[in-house]
């Protein structure tokens, strides 16, 4: 995938919320939101897969520490629809990242890197970002 939006120096602190809203492409196969320290140190690789890498209608999450991927976590809840607008809200603390999906469903992913601030965000794939907000 070619690189889409990249933002750095975010300084997102524990308890603060990152809201990302955008349009899912009508022919979407997958998209990615990466959060962390930099591209080689990700506390969250959030990858909804409509039909990609052998997965269908599955959210795959992972972390990357010093360039090495961790163990994938899969979520069966999949509220994303091709051709629709979707919003994801992500908060974190020392233990977990909490991801709130468009249907209100929330799940947790462990903060394996123990980051005290999220400074990096990258988005890619079949998702056109319309708004990024910090609450």
Curated annotation (Swiss-Prot):
InterPro entries: ConA-like_dom_sf, Galectin-like, Galectin_CRD. The modification N-acetylalanine is found at residue 2. CDD domains: GLECT. A beta-D-galactoside binds at residues 45-49, 53, 62, 69-72. The modification N6-acetyllysine is found at residues 13, 29, 108, 128. The modification Phosphoserine is found at residue 30. One of its GO terms (cellular component) is cytosol. The keyword Secreted applies. It is found in: Secreted, Extracellular space, Extracellular matrix; Cytoplasm; Secreted. GO terms for biological process: apoptotic process; cell-cell adhesion; myoblast differentiation; negative regulation of T-helper 17 cell lineage commitment; plasma cell differentiation; positive regulation of apoptotic process; positive regulation of canonical NF-kappaB signal transduction; positive regulation of inflammatory response. GO terms for molecular function: lactose binding; laminin binding; receptor ligand activity; RNA binding. Expressed in placenta, maternal decidua and fetal membranes. Within placenta, expressed in trophoblasts, stromal cells, villous endothelium, syncytiotrophoblast apical membrane and villous stroma. Within fetal membranes, expressed in amnion, chorioamniotic mesenchyma and chorion (at protein level). Expressed in cardiac, smooth, and skeletal muscle, neurons, thymus, kidney and hematopoietic cells. The modification N6-succinyllysine is found at residue 108. Keywords: Acetylation, Apoptosis, Cytoplasm, Extracellular matrix, Lectin, Phosphoprotein, Secreted. Residues 4-135 form the Galectin domain. Homodimer. Binds LGALS3BP. Interacts with CD2, CD3, CD4, CD6, CD7, CD43, ALCAM and CD45. Interacts with laminin (via poly-N-acetyllactosamine). Interacts with SUSD2. Interacts with cargo receptor TMED10; the interaction mediates the translocation from the cytoplasm into the ERGIC (endoplasmic reticulum-Golgi intermediate compartment) and thereby secretion. Interacts with CD69. Lectin that binds beta-galactoside and a wide array of complex carbohydrates. Plays a role in regulating apoptosis, cell proliferation and cell differentiation. Inhibits CD45 protein phosphatase activity and therefore the dephosphorylation of Lyn kinase. Strong inducer of T-cell apoptosis. Plays a negative role in Th17 cell differentiation via activation of the receptor CD69. This is Galectin-1. It comes from Homo sapiens (Human). The lineage of its organism: Eukaryota, Metazoa, Chordata, Craniata, Vertebrata.
